[in-house]
Amino acid sequence: MLQICPTVHTQTVGTHMKKELLIILFLTINLCFAQTSTEQIELSDSALELTKQDVIYDPSYFSIDYPNGDVPSGKGVCTDVVIRAYRKIGIDLQKEVHIDMKSDFSSYPKIWGLKTTDKNIDHRRVPNLMTFFKRKGAEKNISQSGEDYLPGDIVCWNLGGAITHIGIVVDKKSKDGKRNLIVHNIGGGQVLEDCLFDYRIIGHYRYGI
């Protein structure tokens, strides 16, 4: 009996330790998911907040401050929605894109014939943002399933030809409940619409959240 008891005690302690480790692991995983979810909702809320502002679609070239530069508050294009939403959660895409582009200019598109970076406009071009997000490992799967596009995700579309577009997935559902809505500016200002699958998706990203 004296030989059996220590064995039982050791097994009991080992079992308790395993349970405690599993509980700690479970709580840690849940905490990580909760943190990610919170950051996604923060970006989603930032995008929704932008829909309260009156903005005229204006693709003009503007000379802006750096860092944290922005075009006039009453103007903007699709990329400005993304830039402004990220800036509200402390991420300056103007600065981040410029730094990355400066470090490896040859990896970015040469669509506009530029030979060097331009802090006023580089971050305001969809192909540049797509390249930046991909280089940062933020690329996600492109699918035709609405549940794959979570609040805070960035989606890029091809509207036809060489015309590209970008918007933010937000925490609002379509009327049929099958997909999240999009905050974007396709010409009518910073608006909330059910348009996820209205155009051909060419990019899906989850960056900084």
PLM ranges: what are they?
Residues 18-24:
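Sec-dependent signal peptide recognition
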Residues 36, 64-73, 115-119, 140-144, ...:
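Second-shell loop/turn segments in exported
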Residues 59-79, 92-116:
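Acidic helix-start/capping segments at beta-turn-to-alpha-helix junctions
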Residues 39-44, 102-183:
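...with weaker cross-activation on analogous glycine-rich loops/strands in unrelated enzymes
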Residues 179-209:
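Low-complexity, Gly/Ser/Thr/Pro-rich intrinsically disordered linker/tail segments
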